[in-house]
């Protein structure tokens, strides 16, 4: 229906791209429009809280891009407002709703007790060449709560949480730039009898993969969870390959889910998802604290 940007020129481009009816360069004006009942926030990370709060206080439901907010205090405040106003508040994290995630969970049951998981999600940023020339954009400065862990690692954390739960001990070591964020790093999440390590980087190329090692076999997702097309798994003494291409686009499943529970007015289901998002945000906080970012 409507597109907002601080620049009306950019707002008009968004309007044309997505076939919206209106464009706004004032968030307040957009939020006063009675035809708008949902707002999707995809602004820099540090702006999520302020903009989401404005939307909720204006009576609008919110879908906010990952990472949800900078800390759990911000999330708790917005959950309180959303409950008081009976509004929906969702974190847009596509991997949680992909059919392939359920396929992966089922396969894990076939490889016995899992003891180790290794995940690599690295992606040479389209903005890194400019960064090397001294042009520092949002993703490479703490001013916008950015960095590799927040931008790419958040996918790793949600996946780890979905597969294994919250964890007990957390550590992270990052390559911290002069602007206070990690441009690459590796983390470790420990459980009672399981160790999960992950890498996320925005300054280098790599094969992306997920390797889950069990006592009776292993699983290798050939790529990151949202883009991989096949899974290799060893079980019962045999090496197998499984096609995991989804029928629909990456974002179809999460927005179809949001639509369904909104139409059912299922605020309890929304609360369940908010609890999951808070758990992952707590993990992110602990990892950042371990390396002082």
Q: Could you say what each language-model-derived stretch is?
A:
Residues 1-17:
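NAD(P)-binding Rossmann-fold cofactor-contacting core
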Residues 6, 244-256, 272:
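Active-site loop of classical SDR/Rossmann-like NAD(P)-dependent oxidoreductases
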Residues 7, 18-81:
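Beta-loop-alpha module in the N-terminal Rossmann-like domain of NAD(P)-dependent dehydrogenases
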Residues 16, 38-43, 76, 257-293:
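C-terminal helix-rich "cap/oligomerization" subdomain common to oxidoreductases
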Residues 64, 89-91, 221:
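Hydrophobic residues in well-ordered beta-strands that form the structural core
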Residues 76-94, 114-117:
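Rossmann-fold dehydrogenase core element
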Residues 98-168:
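Predominantly a Rossmann-like dinucleotide-binding segment in NAD(P)-dependent oxidoreductases
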Residues 156-227, 256-264:
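Contiguous beta-strand/loop segments that form the cofactor/metal-binding neighborhood of enzyme cores
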């Amino acid at each position: 229906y409507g597109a907002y940007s601080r620049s009306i020129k950019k707002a008009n481009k968004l309007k044309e791209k997505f076939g919206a009816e209106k464009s706004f360069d004032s968030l307040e004006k957009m939020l006063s429009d009675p035809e708008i009942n949902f707002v999707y926030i995809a602004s820099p990370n540090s702006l999520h809280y302020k903009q989401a709060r404005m939307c909720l206080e204006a009576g609008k439901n919110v879908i906010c891009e990952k990472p949800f907010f900078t800390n759990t205090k911000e999330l708790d405040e917005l959950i309180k407002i959303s409950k008081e106003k009976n509004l929906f508040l969702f974190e847009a994290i596509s991997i949680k709703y992909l059919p392939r995630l359920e396929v992966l969970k089922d396969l894990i049951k076939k490889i016995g007790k899992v003891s180790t998981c290794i995940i690599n999600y690295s992606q040479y940023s389209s903005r890194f060449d400019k960064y090397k020339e001294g042009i520092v954009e949002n993703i490479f400065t703490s001013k916008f709560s950015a960095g590799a862990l927040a931008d790419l690692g958040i996918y790793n954390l949600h996946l780890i949480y979905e597969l294994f739960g919250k964890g007990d001990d957390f550590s992270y070591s990052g390559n911290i730039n002069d602007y206070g964020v990690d441009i690459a790093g590796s983390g470790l999440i420990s459980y009672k009898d399981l160790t999960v390590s992950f890498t996320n980087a925005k300054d280098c190329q790599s094969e992306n993969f997920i390797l889950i090692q069990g006592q009776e076999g292993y699983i290798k997702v050939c790529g990151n969870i949202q883009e991989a097309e096949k899974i290799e798994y060893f079980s019962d003494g045999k090496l197998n390959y499984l096609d995991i291409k989804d029928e629909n686009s990456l974002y179809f499943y999460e927005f179809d889910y949001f639509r369904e529970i909104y139409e059912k007015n299922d605020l309890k289901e929304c609360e369940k998802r908010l609890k999951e998002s808070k758990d992952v945000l707590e993990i992110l906080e602990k990892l950042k604290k371990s390396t002082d970012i």
